């Protein structure tokens, strides 16, 4: 399953998590999920699904798109963890 995080963002409103999916997958599986997501985004509607819920999301013609790479370092062990995030954001 693909992790896609989306927000109907308002500056003064608290964040409400509407959907989350997370699983270890191969690079090939992740790439296939991203291709599928890209095709759905291009149509303007994306279907999010996991084992317990399903949700359709309409994406406007010109949302904001953010790419972020983070490195988090454990202060005790020095172990580094990386997070690559793609985020689509818009207001309604």
Q: PLM ranges: what are they?
A:
Residues 4, 8-9, 60, 83-90:
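Intrinsic, low-complexity terminal and presequence regions
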Residues 69-92:
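C-terminal edge-of-domain segments
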Residues 2-37, 43:
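Terminal, regulation- and interaction-focused segments at domain boundaries
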Residues 21, 42-72:
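Short, structured protein-protein interaction patches enriched in aromatics and acidic/basic residues
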Residues 38, 57, 76-78:
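Generic marker of residues within folded, mature protein domains
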Residues 30, 35-41, 45-52, 80-88:
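Short, low-complexity, charged amphipathic interaction modules
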């Amino acid at each position: 399953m693909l992790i896609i995080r989306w927000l109907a963002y308002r500056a003064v409103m608290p964040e409400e998590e509407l959907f989350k999916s997370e699983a270890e997958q191969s690079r090939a599986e992740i790439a296939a999920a991203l291709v599928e997501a890209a095709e759905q985004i291009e149509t303007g509607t994306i279907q999010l699904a996991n084992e317990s819920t399903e949700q359709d999301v309409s994406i406007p013609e010109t949302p904001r798109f953010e790419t972020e790479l983070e490195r988090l370092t454990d202060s005790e062990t020095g172990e580094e963890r990386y997070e690559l995030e793609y985020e689509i954001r818009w207001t309604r």
